[in-house]
Amino acid sequence: MKKIHYTDRYLLNPYHPVTVFVIGAGGTGSQVATGLARMSVALQALGHPGLHVTVFDPDTVTEANIGRQLFSGSELGLSKAAALVTRINRFFGFSWEAKGQRYPLKASADREEPTLANIIVTCTDNIRSRMNLWRFLKKHREHTSNNERSPIYWMDFGNARTTGQVLIGNIRGKILQPVSNEYLPVPRMNVITEEVRYSTIKEKDSGPSCSLAEALQKQDLFINSILAVSYTHLRAHET
């Protein structure tokens, strides 16, 4: 029988906008956040509360970002997260949030109510950030309550020059699945750090960080947007 995972029922009919953290506002993150904005509008048209997104990125817009990422010359020197979210909010009339810092927040691990969201989306180009994130998230695997701070899924983007992958896994230990005579429901999907042996990957190979010309030699101009479209297409079919 074909294996299938049914989306957590809570996300299909929540009493609040589904909370999403987008970590990284670069080539992929800027495309993903824009796609999520369009998805939120579509969900609201169908009677769903939509999405509330917070974008995290400590970097500022540089000349190397213009062209490969969704930034313009007028945004040079601005926080990537703030520039991206401000543009989305103005266009769609949202009140999404921008954080010019890394996630997880340093204080989160020690706070009684850590900063969490229903869906965590990572769009970073380094391994260490993924490992640090998982050390934080796995502490919340047994989180069973349903509210805007309940962590349920982690989706990770990764790409090389002309290829990439999008992998979604459970933060929550197990997700209740319906009985099916046609499929084999899977209550738990591995996250990226459980699927990939990062100890075998060299950090220098995890993504480009250079001028636009050099970046285009290492990474196809449209690989980020291809991955972002794949993600939003997947999420749309889940909801």
Description of each model-found segment:
Residues 1-20, 41-46:
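N-terminal charged helix/coil linker that caps or initiates catalytic domains
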Residues 11, 39-50, 137-149:
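Alpha-helix termini
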Residues 19-41, 57:
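Glycine-rich adenosine-cofactor-binding loop
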Residues 79-117, 124-128:
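A structured beta-alpha segment of the ubiquitous adenosine-cofactor-binding alpha/beta core
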Residues 232-239:
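Conserved small/polar residues in nucleotide/adenosyl-binding loops
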